[in-house]
């Protein structure tokens, strides 16, 4: 009886920890980049960006979202990528009338 009670307690404990880990959305990256664009994207086509820095992704990247909704991975070390992110940051900070 004691061993079955201990086994049940252990099973419930493991189940509760597992559900907490699976319920935590921040532990799993939403996307990773495996291929980076080699071409510069004109600033006029860019709408926003996000940084991929999760340790589970093999490459650090910037994911640009275009005005047409397409997501494109780019190397954050490239000068044009840094310039584009600065441009988008400034554009988002500028108040619209």
Curated annotation (Swiss-Prot):
This is Eotaxin. Induction: By interferon gamma and lipopolysaccharides (LPS). By interleukin-13 (IL13). The keyword Ligase does not apply. Its main location: secreted. Disulfide bonds join 32-57, 33-73. Glycans are attached at residue 94. GO terms for biological process: actin filament organization; branching involved in mammary gland duct morphogenesis; chronic inflammatory response; eosinophil chemotaxis; ERK1 and ERK2 cascade; immune response; learning or memory; mammary duct terminal end bud growth.
């Amino acid at each position: 009886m004691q061993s079955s009670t201990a086994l049940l307690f252990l099973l419930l404990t493991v189940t509760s920890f597992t559900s907490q880990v699976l319920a935590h959305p921040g532990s799993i990256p939403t996307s990773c980049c495996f291929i980076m664009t080699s071409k510069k994207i004109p600033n006029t086509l860019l709408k926003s960006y996000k940084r991929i820095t999760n340790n589970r992704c093999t490459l650090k990247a910037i994911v640009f979202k275009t005005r047409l909704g397409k997501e494109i991975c780019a190397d954050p070390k490239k000068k044009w990528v840094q310039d584009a992110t600065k441009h988008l940051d400034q554009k988002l900070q500028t108040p619209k009338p």
